[in-house]
Amino acid sequence: MSIAPPPLSVLLELTHRCPLACPYCSNPIALAALREEMDTAGWRSLLQQAADMGVLQAHFSGGEPMLRKDLPELVAHARALGLYSNLITSGVAGGEPMLDQLQAAGLEHVQLSVQDVDPAGADRIAGYRNSLSRKREFAAAVRARGLPLTINAVLHRHNAERVPGMIALALEWQAERIEVAHTQYYGWGLRNRAALMPSREQLLATIDAVETARRQLGDRLAIDFVTPDYYARQPKPCMGGWGQRFVNISPRGDVLPCHAAETIEGMRFDNLRERSLADIWNNGEAFVRFRGTAWMPEVCQGCPKREIDWGGCRCQALALSGDAATLDPVCERSPIHAQVRAAAEQESASPAPAFVYRRPERLAPAAADMLE
C-alpha cells in the first residue's frame, strides 16, 4: 500500500438535478438520476472519512445541491468534523428558508453562478425565466446573513464583452470575490464548443477588462481569471496535479480525480459503497494512473515545467487527441497544438449553432422551447 499526502478539499456532487440547463455545464452527458444518488448516511460517512484523512475543505455542489433536503444536515456534520464548508449554487432553488437552515448548520461561504448581466442573455443561457432577478434576491439574502459571497461568472462568445458589467454586478451585490472564468470544454461544454468558443480578440478584450478592474479596484474586490485553454501555449495543472490536491465524489458515490474523469474510457472508478476513501485515494487505479510524473511521455519528462503543469489535463488530452496518456494538446510542444488553435479560430469565426441544453435525454426540449 502506498500513502499519498491527503487531498486539500473534497467536492461533493450531491446531485445532477438542476433547475438550470446551461450549455457549458461540466457535468457528464450521462446525468445521474435521483434513484442513483447516494443517501444521507453515505454522504455523512464520506465526510467522516475525509476528515479522518486530513481533508480541510468540503465543497457542496451539483447539479444544484439545494435540491437535497438533507443539505443542512450534511453541512452541520461537516462543521462538527472541523471541515470548512462552501456551497456552490445557482441561487434559484431552496430560497431563504433553506438558507436560514444552512446558516444555522454552520455554512461558511457561498459561491453563486451568474450567466450574464443582461437579463435576456442570462435566461437564454440558463434556460430559466427571470434567472438574474432570482439570483439578485438570493445574493441579497446571503449578504443579509453575513455570509461571504463569491460570484462565478462563466464567459463565452455570447457574453465576453460584458466583463466590466459582471465586475460591477459583483460590487453591487457586495461580493468579496468574483471568478471570471472562460468556459472549460468538458461535458456539456464540449458538446456545445462551437456554440460557445470566443474569438482571440474577445479573449484579449476580457484580459484587458480584468486587468483594468484590478488596477482600479485594488483590494475592494478579489478578481480571479481563468482563460480558455484552446488559445493557450502552456496547459494548466489538472486540479493542481492529478490525484494530488483534490477529490471529487459523484452523485452515485464514485470517487474521481476530477469532475470530468469519467470521460476516460477503460479507467476503473471505485465507489464508496465498496471501498474506503483513503484506500481509493492511495491505491485506486484512477488516482495512481496519472499521479506524479512517471506516466508522462518523453516530451513531458524533459520539460522543466513538468512539476508545475503536471502534463496538463488528462480529460482534455483524451478529448482532443484520443489519448489520455499524452501531453495536453494545448501545450505548444504538442504535435497537434496548431490544430487545436485553428479549430478554436474556425469555430469562433463561424455562425454559432443552436445550444444543446443540459437536460436528461428524456426531458431534453428543443432549444426554442426552453423559454416559452
From Swiss-Prot:
The keyword Transmembrane does not apply. Pathway: Cofactor biosynthesis; pyrroloquinoline quinone biosynthesis. One of its GO terms (molecular function) is cyclase activity. [4Fe-4S] cluster binds at C18, C22, C25. Its EC number is 1.21.98.4. Gene3D superfamilies: Aldolase class I. The keyword Acyltransferase does not apply. Keywords: 4Fe-4S, Iron, Iron-sulfur, Metal-binding, Oxidoreductase, PQQ biosynthesis, S-adenosyl-L-methionine. It catalyses: [PQQ precursor protein] + S-adenosyl-L-methionine = E-Y cross-linked-[PQQ precursor protein] + 5'-deoxyadenosine + L-methionine + H(+). It is an enzyme of class 1 (oxidoreductase). NCBIfam families: PQQ_syn_pqqE (TIGR02109), rSAM_more_4Fe4S (TIGR04085). Belongs to the radical SAM superfamily. PqqE family. This is PqqA peptide cyclase.
